[in-house]
């Protein structure tokens, strides 16, 4: 199941799938915090290894193996659990262990502390203001796209995980490619019918995708599922199916947090 990144690689170190490996201990926070552990269920089908073992063996080859003092995944997990009061055997019944039977609520009078200069919720952040950022900005109206241009909106569905499952035989049969949702009236203006191949382009990339004409989308926007448009030819089922939204996304980001702004790209749509 080649990814596009693996397709470009000179050397591939294949990791076992989630059913074929034991993972590190993970923690879930909340009112009833707990730790959970995914254990190997079946033997690997091919010459693959656990991710932590791949890292250890690379480290040994470059002389830093002393930073990875374990010989297998069980040893690593037991080391993680040292001092917690839990053992690997405690996970066998349910796959997780809770820190206690009761929910842990915050002490609302004395225990609710905020890491702000005032110790309170700051709608106008003094930390951001002191760093030169306007922390309580005024509303700026957004210019509506026109002339065959639309705001690109992307999202996911419950059938696929990121870009890693589109070549899975069963999931590919259910959802093999993404479509471009476009408003019925806007599609009519552009001469686009449901199922027509359309050309979509942005200032940084382009592609061809099938149109899904619907009333269930805003006239100023178009929508596509994330995770398609694979370029790896050995991923034969997902290769060249649909369009990757990453090809179209312009480099716009949140200047304070640094996160990408996924819905700030304007695209042009026309009959292919």
Regions found by a protein language model. Give the residues of each.
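Residues in well-ordered beta-strands of folded domains
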Residues: 36, 115, 122-124, 151-155, ...
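Short, glycine-/Ser/Thr-/acidic-enriched flexible segments
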Residues: 1-3, 18-20, 41-42, 47, ...
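Long, low-complexity segments enriched in small/aliphatic residues
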Residues: 74-170
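Glycine-rich, flexible loop/turn motifs
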Residues: 21, 31-33, 38, 63, ...
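Short, well-ordered loop/turn elements at secondary-structure boundaries
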Residues: 7-9, 109, 117, 146-148, ...
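Structural motif
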Residues: 11, 34, 149-151, 179, ...
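Flexible glycine/proline-rich, aromatic-decorated loop/lid segments
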Residues: 3-38
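Long, contiguous, secondary-structure-rich segments that constitute the structural scaffold
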Residues: 41, 45, 50-94, 168-181, ...
